[in-house]
C-alpha cells in the first residue's frame, strides 16, 4: 500500500477510566469518568472520530480518512472499559478499538504492569518500597553491587515521577530477570495491596462473557 503521513491520524490510547477519588485506589494514575466525558466532548468538537474499519481500510486500501481523523483505543482489557467507557461511547454513537490481553482474562492472573501500578497507588512511602525491593533482590541472588549500578543507571526522574519511583518501575518492568521480577512483584503486591491475585484479576479485567458482549456492541 502507499505510504501515508502519520499526521493524518491521531491515536488516543486510554487505560484506566473510572471514579478514582474516594475509591479503594485513590492514588492510581487514571482518568476520572467526568474527565473522560470532557475529553470526548473536545474530540467530537475538534476531530473526526473514526472507526477501526476506517483505519483498516486506510492501511489496506489507502482509502482517505476524514480531516483531523482520530482513533480511540482502549488497552489492557480493563473492566473499566466495559463498565464505564463502552456505555459512554454507545450513548454518543462513537466507536473505539479494544485490545484485551488473553492471558489475564483466560488464566486469571494479573499483568506485572498492573501489579506495579497498584502497589504504587497503595503506598505513600516510595523509600520503603525501594528498600523492600532491594532486600528482596538480595534474597533472590542480585548482588548489592548490581543494585547500586541499576540505581545509578535507572533512577532518573522525569516529569511524571521522581527518581525512586522510576527506579522501582524499571526494576520490575524489565531490568531484573523475568523470574526474579515476577516473584518480587507478587510478594510486594500481597504485602502492600493485600488482595489475592486471582480475586484482583477478576475485579480488574473483563471476563470472557463481557468480552463477547463488547464484540457484539
Predicted region positions:
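Membrane-proximal basic amphipathic "stem/tether" segments
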Residues: 1-13, 21, 27
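C-terminal domain-boundary segment and adjacent tail
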Residues: 28-64, 203-216
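Short, solvent-exposed loop/turn segments at secondary-structure junctions
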Residues: 16-19, 55-57, 77-79, 103-106, ...
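Membrane-embedded segments
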Residues: 73, 77-85
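Structural preference for beta-strand elements that scaffold enzyme active sites
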Residues: 9-11, 69-71, 95-97
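Extended, charge-rich helix/loop segments that form flexible
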Residues: 2-4, 109-217
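Conserved, mostly hydrophobic/aromatic
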Residues: 12, 43, 75, 89, ...
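A short alpha/beta connector and helix-capping loop motif
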Residues: 84-102
Amino acid at each position: 500500500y502507499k505510504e501515508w503521513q502519520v499526521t493524518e491520524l491521531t491515536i488516543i490510547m486510554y487505560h484506566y477510566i473510572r471514579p478514582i477519588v474516594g475509591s479503594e485506589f485513590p492514588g492510581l494514575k487514571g482518568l476520572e469518568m467526568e474527565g473522560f466525558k470532557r475529553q470526548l466532548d473536545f474530540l467530537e468538537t475538534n476531530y473526526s472520530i473514526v472507526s477501526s474499519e476506517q483505519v483498516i481500510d486506510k492501511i489496506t486500501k489507502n482509502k482517505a480518512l476524514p480531516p483531523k481523523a482520530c482513533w480511540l483505543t482502549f488497552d489492557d482489557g480493563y473492566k473499566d472499559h466495559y463498565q464505564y467507557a463502552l456505555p459512554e461511547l454507545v450513548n454518543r454513537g462513537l466507536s473505539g478499538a479494544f485490545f484485551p490481553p488473553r492471558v489475564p482474562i483466560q488464566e486469571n492472573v494479573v499483568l506485572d504492569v498492573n501489579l506495579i501500578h497498584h502497589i504504587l497507588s497503595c503506598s505513600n512511602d516510595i523509600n520503603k518500597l525501594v528498600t523492600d525491593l532491594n532486600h528482596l533482590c538480595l534474597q533472590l541472588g542480585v548482588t548489592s553491587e548490581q543494585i547500586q549500578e541499576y540505581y545509578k543507571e535507572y533512577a532518573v526522574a522525569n516529569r511524571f515521577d521522581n527518581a525512586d519511583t522510576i527506579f522501582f518501575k524499571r526494576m520490575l518492568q524489565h531490568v531484573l530477570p523475568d523470574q526474579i521480577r515476577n516473584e518480587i512483584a507478587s510478594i510486594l503486591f500481597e504485602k502492600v495491596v493485600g488482595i489475592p491475585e486471582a480475586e484482583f484479576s477478576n475485579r480488574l479485567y473483563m471476563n470472557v462473557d463481557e468480552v463477547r458482549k463488547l464484540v457484539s456492541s
